[in-house]
Amino acid sequence: MGDLDPAPYKQKLSEMYNYVKTNLPSNIEEAHEAAMQEAKENGDDNEALEQLERATLSAAIAEADAMDVSDNLNPKDFEFKTKVDTLKFVQSALDFIDQYEDASANLHGMLLSANSSDVTEALRFFVKARHFKLPCAVTGMKQALTLMWSNEQNIKEEVLKAFVDVFIAIPGSEGSDFLPGDQIAYNLLLLADNATMSELASIEEAISCLVKEGRIPAEVFSILWTATSKGTGTSRATALEVIAMAANADRSIVESKSRLKTLLDVALGEYTEEYRDWKLARAAGIALQRVERAQVDLTCAKYLVLERIIEQLCTVARGDWCVDSNEKNTLEWFSAAEQVIGAIFVVSPKPEESCADIIRGMHIQTLGSNSVEQCHPLRLARFFHVLGHIALKLLVYTESLSGAVRRANAKKTLKKQEEADKAKAQASASADDDQIEAELGMAAEVEAENERKVAEIAEREIVGRGLLSVFGPLLVRVVENDGERFNSEILMQTSTLALCKFMCVSSSFCETHLPVIFRALAKAPACDVVLRANTVIALGDLAFRFPNEVEPYTPRLYACLRDSSTTVRRHTLMVLTHLILNDMVKVKGQVCEIALCLKDDDQRIRDTSRLLFHELSKRSNNPVYNLLPDIISQLSQISIAKDDFRGIMSFLLGYIKKERQNEMLIDKLCQRFPKCSSISQKADITYCMAQLKVNERSIKCLMDNFKLYKDALFDEDVKRHFLSIITKAKKLSKPELKQSLEEWESKLNEQAELGMENKLAGEKAAEAKALASKRTSRRRQNQIETIPEMEEEEEDANEEMKDDYDGEDKENTSHRTSSISIKKSTRSSRRGVGMSNSVAT
């Protein structure tokens, strides 16, 4: 075990632990059994039993440490001590390996350093780590390969050198001597296995460069083809993926008839159908995209193989081998279908006809005579997925044809121009010159006409009048989902994405259906993160292709930065960053949303927002300066913690470097004081001013605008920030300025004291007013409470009057009424003079 691969050490550690547990010293074994029995009787849980096991092992190890070899140990005790010593050694080795693994995290960061020497040293570490078989070497090299996209050529060369040293060359040979072919193939499979999409792209770039330079032996690809044919599990697909990467630089690796036959039999044949190995089918689609388009020739064996391959590609694209009862199967098929359709557009002589056959076949299988509500959701999802991807590929195919025509015309025009130059050199007749120039002008007109026709095809034909247009209304119906008739998450995800792909083709179709997409985004369930994340990415593509159509909906795109899902917020910020830096979206107006991302809970979101502002600050006009007033205003009006606000502004104000910008920003901030509705907003403004650099002109600006902020100086926060500005200004060491600063400081302190007195007086007046208001309210409440008593007494009086009328003669009625009135008057006089007078009258 001379290397640092942890696997054999872990296996040895397990063996030693098992030996110690089964060969405990007698005294420890008895104590262990007694403790275990007691624990079981007490009903202790598994965690307690595991702790007991660990304690027993610790006691056994301590017992072995106490043994002295010089004491003539018996063979059993000697063996036990030897095993325990081995166990301790192996555990120490694993701890040592863990130390290296933990340290590798810092080296990952060094790979991103702006200092090229840091990058070089980190690469050297991962090369050595690979030679010692440390696991961190592979993960480190995967991250290092992202530097293949660096603009610095020397960095790319260092990465390629490290790649060769780690995976291709014999250790210590400096890349001159190669490992055996099967070892190189194994290393490449290890690198590509379980790699992410971004990692695979970087690996492909590195392998392509090495193949062009001839630094990967040809026998390696023969071994990989054998692994594709006879491998097991995922190794087949991984081997074919690596082959496709190499074929990007050398088509001959895939293009021969025998290789194509292997692809047909292995990746698109019975094996894939039986095991539903969509990863292998996907790899086959990628590999076939490296092959030249088939030329119809029935006598050519290669064409006949390609013809059969195209048939199988259509079978895979239709989903004929999918299982409707298995959702995972369909999810894996999606990726394979995309690459297979891409391969059809590369190798098929007439890809549009092949795609039409796929669509008609899927339409019959999916809908047939049934309504859309009766269709199996997975079948419908597969159908929509194919529709969307074919629409997108038709657009790309149309534009590629336009490019081919444009290149042919350019070549033809260049030839005519050369002829014209030659004719002029020979002083030919002017009529001939005029004729050639006329032909050149006509060529330009023809080229413009061709481009117009291509644009018209994309705008009107693909999703407007062609076969795909038939299914546009169906897509819209499912995406809108009125009445919640479709409840399959996969169906809603694929239908929304397919509609977005349709919209990428035509600007008019896009403008018409943008409201549908945004309604679907708003109605998306909180649990369906995939739908919202995919929709945001699709909207980014639409904004890049049709910025004018998407521009009115920009605020709704920014609103996704407040989504509850971290994934959605990440994707939204990445999309907006891409659009803003490419000037496809205006940042002003919603910039506050991006500024808030600087304090997001997710580290990647915080880093991305920092990167965006950093890139903006590097532009000549420094947009950050122009955005700051809006950011300050909007952040002051929303509910945000003071520390968060100040953290955001401290970061952004650090980008204001020019003196003139500092002066103008201070003036703009001063003008905002009268517009503030609370003292906290004024404190925020003064904090921002305190972070800026000051000079004589900015100090004069603050002094001249004293009346704008004097009413806020009673606040300790506001006063403290102004005093900090004065402290910074005093360091300018100009005598005449120091006198002005002292006068300004004295003025600030006086106004602060006066403001505090006014504040206290106002608070006392408010307290007195509140107390008077309480008394008035209490008096009114008492009056309201007496009304029911008055009504009750009036009812009593009415009852008495009724009794008197019933008991007396009519001739004495007048006398009795007067008597009762006198009684009422007497009662009422207790409650108020007004009521008493009324009764008396």
Give the location of each predicted region.
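Arg/Lys-rich low-complexity patches in intrinsically disordered regions that function as generic
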Residues: 772-781, 816-834
